[in-house]
Regions:
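N-terminal glycine-rich phosphate/pyrophosphate-binding loop and immediately adjacent elements
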Residues: 2-128
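A conserved FAD-binding loop/helix module that cradles the flavin
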Residues: 54, 442-465
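Rossmann-like flavin
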Residues: 96-192
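A glycine-rich dinucleotide-binding beta-alpha-beta segment and adjacent secondary-structure elements
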Residues: 173-185, 382-446
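Helical element adjacent to the flavin cofactor pocket in flavoenzyme catalytic cores
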Residues: 198-243
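Mid-domain catalytic core of redox enzymes
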Residues: 240-344
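C-terminal segments that line or cap access tunnels to active or ligand-binding sites in enzymes
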Residues: 296-399
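Active-site-proximal substrate-binding core of FAD-dependent oxidoreductases
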Residues: 466-473
Length: 473
């Protein structure tokens, strides 16, 4: 039995703890905050609850694969402890771009339907391949057929932008709608693999889901699995330094044989070296996330997930790269009617504004935030600014997200050149020069949301168990 310390009780940390404890190892999770889930945090306003962080779940087969893996490793049964149900939304989202409005998947009556159908048919067949890559190491031989299928579609067009530009049959505005999804990795389509185009089609064909009760239910389910398997989870424990075989905290030290880090690489390095966490020159986007309880309902035609796009995406990406406020940005509006997802008695809304990772604190009247709120209100057809409908609200800024590690509040940390994608990604799950350290989380598997986080955990944990094995009974 190996003694393992897991740093961070976000989704990847909890998932790692559950699998490793289920395999028979002694696992302790250390979390500096007093809640489970990391960025996925449960808050309460005016007696109503909402969950921060990622709001939607795609590729449900990854969650099922995680549960199947958990069951295969030990005696605890996932069905007895996970207790997690999902509800599928009617559409992936409604997109607003200049004078265009469309749902994904595009409806038959829309003038983009023919182009969308062609695109969708070309990429639907890649959905199993994407799922395989989400849960497989890039050098895993079993992933080669999936990579081969993608190579046939993309050819030498490696980036999302180069591939989308090559689709002569597709209207320019629809190309922009598909390309905007690269912000799920925090960067522009010029800096992401063409895979992101296919992920849009896969999401549209499979649909997207929300856990009943909110996304934080995933963190709670993972914690129940971890505890059932024998892991210990300690909240409110701040790590002060990391040594060769122990972790120092404000409350004492924890020895380990192996260390699993879900922390941002900059934070991990600072704890290892004692040097300050520096602001990366190239980093992913951040956000100004506004969570509110509404005085009254939004119009009946407002869907659960709306995407308000900028008129000029290139200007947005340029501003984000320079870490300055954009003229217009991409904003998600997640609207939950009373009793729909959360057990609330009032409607709630999350207005999630893509922001530069500048580490700053903004409010509703910061000029660019104010402009964006007014633009969102106009696009949704509201008679007043959306914040005039707030009964109570809370704003989470880049300075808040910086507390989770990435300097400046970059949601996915520092970005890397395109050639460092896949097998060359840095940081890696495991570096032979640091044999006791393993990494999980968004920094080693950026983009792809919750499935990528869970998939990355499966990849890292499988490799770890191959190395250290399961304790003999």
């Amino acid at each position: 039995m190996a003694k393992i310390v897991v740093l961070g009780a976000g989704l990847s940390g909890l998932a790692s703890a559950a699998l490793l404890a289920q395999a028979g190892h002694e696992v302790t999770v250390l979390e500096k905050n007093n809640w489970l889930g990391g960025k996925s945090r449960r808050i309460e306003l005016a007696g109503q609850r909402m969950d921060t962080g990622p709001a939607l779940v795609t590729f449900p087969e990854v969650w099922q694969q995680f549960l199947d893996t958990f069951d295969s490793l030990g005696t605890a049964r996932s069905k007895e402890h996970a207790d997690l149900n999902f509800t599928k939304l009617k559409e992936v989202g409604r997109y607003y771009l200049r004078n265009h409005v469309t749902d994904l998947p595009v409806k038959p009556e829309h003038h983009w339907y023919k182009a969308w159908q062609q695109f969708s048919e070309e990429h639907d067949a890649l959905t199993p391949a994407i799922s395989k890559l989400l849960t497989s190491h890039p050098l895993d031989p079993s992933a080669l057929p999936a990579l081969g299928k993608m190579a046939k579609v993309y050819g030498l067009r490696l980036t999302t932008s180069s591939y989308i530009r090559s689709l002569a049959y597709m209207p320019q505005a629809l190309k922009e709608v598909i390309s905007i999804h690269t912000l799920n990795a925090g960067v522009s389509p010029n800096r992401t693999l063409a895979l992101y185009a296919s992920m849009t089609a896969a999401m549209a064909s499979q649909g997207i889901s929300v856990p009943v009760g909110g996304v934080n239910e995933i963190a709670l389910a993972l914690s129940r699995l971890a505890v059932a398997a024998g892991a210990k989870i300690e909240l409110g424990v701040s790590v002060t330094s990391i040594g060769h075989r122990s972790v120092a905290t404000e409350n004492g030290s924890y020895g380990f044989y192996h260390l699993v880090s879900s922390l941002d690489p900059g934070v991990l390095k600072a704890l290892q070296t004692g040097k300050p966490n520096r602001l990366a020159k190239h980093r992913s986007c951040s956000g100004v996330a506004i969570y509110a309880v509404l005085k009254e309902s939004l119009p009946s035609d407002v869907v659960t997930h709306s995407v308000i796009m900028p008129d000029d995406a290139d200007q947005l990406h340029s501003s984000l790269d320079k870490a300055v406020p954009p003229e217009q940005t991409m904003t998600f509006v997640n609207y939950y009617r009373a009793g729909e997802i959360y057990p609330n008695t009032k409607d709630t809304v999350a207005v999630l504004i893509t922001a530069p990772a500048d580490g700053k604190k903004h409010d509703l009247n910061s000029e660019w935030v104010r402009n964006e709120l007014d633009r969102v209100s106009q696009k949704l057809g509201l008679k007043v600014a959306i914040d005039e409908l707030f009964e109570a609200y809370e704003v989470l800024n880049p300075d808040y997200f910086a507390q989770f590690g990435a300097a400046g509040g970059a949601l996915y940390g520092a970005t890397t050149p395109l050639w460092q994608s896949g097998p060359f990604h840095n940081p890696q799950y495991h570096n032979p020069l640091r044999p006791r350290l393993w990494r999980v989380g968004a920094s080693v598997h950026p983009g792809g949301g919750i499935p990528a986080v869970l998939g990355g955990t499966l990849i890292a944990t499988r490799a770890m168990l191959r190395k250290i094995g399961k304790p003999k009974k």
